[in-house]
Design a protein with these regions (language model features):
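Bacterial N-terminal signal peptides
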Residues: 12-23
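Bacterial N-terminal signal peptides that target proteins for export
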Residues: 2-12
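General marker for long, soluble alpha-helical cores
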Residues: 22-345
Length: 345
């Protein structure tokens, strides 16, 4: 037998060994463990699925209506009984087997992908979806209608991660259309998700527009929601004497705790025409109504906002002002600040 002929069986054995040791990822089963709790409301359950694969460990927990499952009924008894039920989604079917009692249960699950769904997704531009991808789509109920709806709304070729994020956070086709009708079209998936996460809804936009805020960016809207610059806050500030401000100013006031009560307190002491910048600067540097009241009681009733801020920046305390006033009844704010700058006490 030639050397070449003898080498062929060895090569075949090597290939077979490699195949046995390193199975193809596509052949790996999608399965794992599940834990279910029946919620106080009879029609909902909390389901947690846990998997360990070559990707690592993953866990997903969601509240579902019991109608999302086929064959799931709540046992009357607190004693475990065998259970088998399914979650049928466009992307495939999850089959759950294990034990259930009146409070919940646990067991193993497996997932069978739907090849027809994968083919439809390929036609929509989402090709090369793995079984792992399809499992994720099933868990989060990313169905044909959702993907087609986003495509029709102007998002035909979203990445898989964008699809999942938009589904999880409720950036639905209807949400996208509603925003587009208000002038917010062509937003990025990240912008849409951020708006949903922080509650920058069409209703929120409408309330702001009623107050004169017509051309806010998506970033403005998200920042206002994050920091609590709500329509109610803006109305309160207007009633206190600070009229329409920019989105940035509204956010700055919220960050630095400029409240309607703060502004009203200052107005009562003669500061009738505060700007949002004035109010923010006073809050940043600790010019409180109490500080202003004490300074005025020492005779500095005409101190401007800039004077008050300068006094706080340079450490002109009420005790220092009182002591200097006792020495020189005619001392001015500028002189007090200069004394502190140069270390005189």
């Amino acid at each position: 037998m030639s050397e070449k002929s003898r080498s062929r069986p060895a090569l075949a054995l090597a290939i077979l060994a490699a195949t046995l040791v390193f199975p193809r990822v596509a052949d790996a089963a999608i399965d794992g463990r599940w834990i279910l709790e029946f919620e106080p409301k009879e029609d909902r359950v909390q389901l947690t699925t846990k998997r360990t694969s070559w990707h690592g460990h993953s866990e997903n927990s969601c509240s579902y209506p019991t109608s999302a499952f086929r064959g799931l009924t709540r046992p009357k008894s607190s004693t475990d009984s065998p259970a088998r039920f399914e979650m049928v989604r466009d992307a495939g079917t999850l089959t759950f087997e294990g034990q259930l009692d009146s409070g919940g249960g646990s067991g193993r699950f497996s997932f069978q992908a739907d090849s027809a769904f994968a083919a439809d997704m390929a036609k929509l531009g989402h090709d090369h979806l793995s079984d792992e991808n399809l499992y994720t789509m099933a868990v989060h109920d990313i169905d044909r209608a959702f993907v087609r709806g986003l495509a029709d709304a102007g998002y035909p070729r979203l990445s898989f991660d964008d699809l999942v994020a938009m589904r999880i956070h409720g950036a639905t086709p209807q949400f996208v259309r509603d925003l587009a009708s208000l002038g917010y079209s062509h937003l990025s998936p990240d912008d849409l998700v951020a708006m949903r996460i922080h509650g920058a809804t069409p209703e929120f936009i409408g309330e702001l527009r009623a107050l004169g805020y017509e051309r806010l960016s998506s970033d403005d809207l998200v920042a206002m929601r994050i920091h609590g610059a709500t329509p109610e806050f803006l109305k309160g500030m207007a009633a206190a004497g600070i009229g329409k401000v920019s989105a940035d100013d509204a956010v700055a006031m919220r960050i630095h705790e400029v409240t309607p009560e703060f502004v009203r307190s200052l107005r009562e002491m003669g500061y009738d025409h505060l700007s949002s910048d004035d109010a923010v600067s006073m809050r940043i540097h600790g010019v409180t109504p109490e500080f202003v009241r004490q300074i005025q009681a020492l005779g500095f009733r005409d101190a401007s906002v800039d004077d008050l801020v300068s006094m706080r920046i340079h450490g002109v305390t009420t005790d220092f002002a009182r002591k200097m006033k006792a020495r020189d009844p005619g001392v001015t704010v500028d002189e007090l600040v200069s004394m502190r700058i140069h270390g005189r006490d």
